[in-house]
């Protein structure tokens, strides 16, 4: 709820310059890159559920205290704390899903997880915008309270599904796998490269896309907002059915097709100037999103050693954070350097390259039905 309005809060409430306020987003992104893998490693050591609980409670407390920070250094410190606490949740939650869901159902489970996230992201910014018009302090307070409530719910609910998951026992079983081992997994690193590239393309919807629509196609900000609504409605209505319908597909197929749909959807913007055409491109890359992201999480769950799922999910989370940190900046720079047409051809090339990296990094033998057989 707070993050989309952080720059607005810093400029209007605290009087920061736009450059200083914008730098806080970079601070948040850099912190996410660092703390995501830490959250994954902690999940392997103490269990995913404790990490999720601490992450939510600590994030809520930091949000309560955030308005007390008034100068640049204090705000930067609060932003690091906030990002550190919040971003440890993602790899822990992915590891938790992997632990409790059967291999043949993981892609659907990750799709349901994304459904919940998208519903929250559709409600949160709208509520945050309303609260920001009343009081920025109210916005921080409501976000803090809802986060604390989520942490409390996780703390008091008896999660029987986790009763058989003993991370310490898992650590004693099998070889110890540290960061150096992950770095020597060549296919895994190539896969992460594909994740970063397709993430850069995806996050253009936050930077180059709105600038292109408003400044070059002379469409209204309301039209850009409508595209978000279309994207969310498609995901809420179709992602789970699509993932269920393609459940027998190997992850490899979903990954490759998803990357190509991103490449086509964003690349076609260089050839289209009409509102209807723009809507069509959003539909195309949204279908890519619905295929790609559940399959990426499922592939991570499939290849990660049982006693290091958190570490692998942390590396995956870090890759997405890298994309989020550099993607919007890269898009705006390319838009200024190459112009409003060629920037989208670059995005097509990046998406196609990501698909090729998926071909190299996900061999045919690592297919979802193989994982089912191994897990049965």
Residue ranges and their predicted role:
Residues 132-145, 333-351:
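A membrane-interface helix-boundary motif in multi-pass transporters
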Residues 35-47, 238-251, 335:
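Helix-to-loop junctions at the C-terminal end of transmembrane segments
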Residues 29-37, 121-122, 232-240, 324-325:
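Residue-level signature of mid-helix packing/kink "hotspots" within the transmembrane helices
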Residues 78-119:
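Cytoplasmic helix-loop-helix junction between adjacent transmembrane helices
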């Amino acid at each position: 709820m707070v993050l989309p309005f952080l720059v607005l809060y810093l400029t209007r409430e605290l009087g920061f310059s736009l450059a200083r306020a914008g730098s806080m987003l970079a601070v948040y992104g850099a912190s996410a890159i660092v703390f995501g893998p830490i959250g994954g490693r902690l999940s392997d050591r103490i269990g995913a559920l404790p990490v999720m609980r601490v992450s939510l409670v600590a994030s809520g407390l930091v949000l309560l205290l955030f308005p007390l920070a008034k100068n640049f250094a204090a705000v930067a410190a609060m932003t690091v704390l906030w990002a550190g606490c919040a971003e440890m949740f993602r790899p822990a939650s992915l590891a938790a899903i992997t632990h409790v869901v059967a291999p043949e159902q993981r892609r659907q489970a990750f799709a349901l997880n994304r459904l919940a996230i998208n519903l929250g992201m559709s409600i949160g910014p709208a509520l945050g915008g309303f609260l920001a018009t009343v009081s920025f302090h109210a916005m921080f307070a409501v976000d803090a309270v809802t986060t604390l409530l989520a942490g409390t719910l996780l703390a008091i609910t008896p999660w029987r599904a986790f009763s058989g998951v003993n991370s310490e026992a898992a650590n004693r079983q099998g070889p110890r796998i540290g960061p150096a081992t992950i770095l020597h997994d060549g296919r895994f690193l190539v896969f992460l490269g594909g994740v970063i590239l397709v993430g850069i393309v995806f996050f253009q919807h936050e930077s180059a896309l709105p600038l292109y629509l408003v400044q070059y196609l002379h469409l209204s900000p309301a039209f850009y907002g409508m595209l978000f609504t279309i994207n969310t409605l498609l995901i809420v209505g179709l992602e789970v059915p699509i993932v269920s319908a393609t459940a027998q597909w190997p992850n490899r197929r979903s990954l490759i097709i998803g990357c190509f749909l991103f490449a086509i959807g964003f690349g076609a913007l260089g050839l289209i100037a009409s509102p209807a055409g723009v809507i069509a491109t959003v539909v195309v890359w949204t279908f890519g999103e619905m295929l790609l992201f559940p399959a990426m999480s499922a592939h991570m769950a499939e290849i990660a050693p049982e006693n290091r799922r958190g570490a692998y999910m942390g590396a995956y989370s870090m890759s997405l954070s890298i994309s989020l940190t550099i993607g919007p900046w890269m898009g705006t720079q390319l838009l200024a350097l190459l112009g409003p047409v060629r920037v989208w051809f670059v995005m097509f090339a990046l998406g196609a390259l990501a698909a090729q990296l998926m071909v190299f990094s996900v061999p045919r033998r690592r297919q979802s039905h193989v994982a089912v057989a191994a897990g049965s």
